[in-house]
């Protein structure tokens, strides 16, 4: 309705590929000159381009406060046994790929498993993802842990204490928890199907793996 109007419009895109089959019929095929499209990253831009390839989209990445400079209560991670902690945060759904992370952990050599710990944080939106995590925590109770919810202070404390963030998403425009980890100077291992993959400098502040492949994730 605003296309071609006198009102300047900034249209900010942060949707995943998964949403476009449901909304594509509502997206105009041509935009007035008053409309400017921006996206949270290349993944979000590619998602729009999957249905409107002719749209000109510019990057506009969100900002977050410097949480690392704030004061927050301490979250007790002693259950991780003092080992390097690899954490992932987000709702349990196919798009978020918790099952991929679970499979990657199972592929690790026993000697590597003994030296590391893993934490899954999030609500169970899809039973299949929750089942994968529950099965893994049952098989590896000393190394793999699940927490349904953390407060904002607890999330900040987790970011301050963990070793690395892992995002195994199949379709994720710009996962906030990875950005929060980067604020705390923590490296991230992310899927190529995340907006964050376009920001990572390989081997410097993280690693990117391809093809939603648990073996490639395990190698990282």
Task: Report each predicted region and the residues it spans.
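Short alpha-helical donor nucleotide-sugar binding micro-motif in glycosyltransferases
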Residues: 149, 157-162
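Aromatic "clamp/platform" in nucleotide-sugar-dependent glycosyltransferases that forms part
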Residues: 170
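A short, active-site helix/loop in glycosyltransferases that binds the activated sugar's phosphate group
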Residues: 21, 33-59, 64-68
């Amino acid at each position: 309705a605003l296309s071609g109007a006198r009102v300047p419009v900034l249209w900010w895109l942060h949707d995943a590929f998964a949403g476009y089959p449901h909304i594509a019929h509502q997206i105009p095929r041509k935009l007035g000159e008053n409309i400017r499209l921006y996206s949270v990253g290349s993944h979000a831009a590619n998602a729009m381009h999957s249905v409107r390839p002719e749209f000109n989209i510019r990057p506009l990445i969100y900002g977050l406060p410097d949480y690392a400079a704030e004061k927050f209560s301490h979250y007790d991670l002693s259950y991780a046994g003092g080992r390097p902690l690899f954490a992932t945060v987000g709702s349990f759904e196919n798009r978020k790929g918790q099952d991929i992370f679970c499979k990657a952990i199972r592929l690790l050599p026993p000697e590597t498993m003994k030296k590391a710990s893993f934490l899954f944080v999030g609500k169970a939106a899809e039973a299949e993802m929750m089942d994968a995590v529950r099965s893994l925590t049952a098989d590896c109770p000393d190394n793999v842990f699940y927490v349904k919810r953390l407060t904002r202070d607890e999330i900040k404390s987790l970011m301050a204490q963990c070793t690395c963030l892992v995002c195994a998403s199949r379709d994720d425009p710009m996962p906030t928890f990875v950005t929060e980890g980067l604020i705390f100077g923590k490296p991230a291992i992310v899927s190529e199907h995340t907006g964050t993959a376009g920001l990572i400098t390989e081997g410097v502040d993280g690693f990117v793996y391809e093809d939603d492949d648990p073996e490639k994730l395990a190698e990282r």
